[in-house]
Amino acid sequence: NATLIGSLLDAGLTPVFCAITHDGNGSLLNCNADSIASAVAKGLARLADTDLIFCFEQPGVMRDINDPASVIASITRESYGALRAEGVVTDGMIPKIENALEAVDSGVRSVTIRRSEGILIPGGTRISH
């Protein structure tokens, strides 16, 4: 409900979303937090310019996981396919980038994958068309 979320933001409130959901039958489910953030951003993008930042423990998507200086500055859908084929993007980074691409395709102005430290300083990996 993007309108409700927008109303909360307009009132100066910061909604917090949890990746734990339920199936309606009493069982708890651990959902992908990036999927939830992407869904919220896609909804908000219908109301206003929206930027999404996925924060995790690395400085961005790295060509070499052991070299923090190997951050890939920008990934497009085309380059993502090549990075997967090369084995650079694997495991948990796959759904993170796919959620980012879906968000951009749905009108989110920008998506960045990065560390939370220094979040106001440009950096990380920008996902674009």
Task: Please report, for each region that a protein language model flagged, where it lies by residue.
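C-terminal catalytic "cap/lid" subdomain
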Residues: 1-129
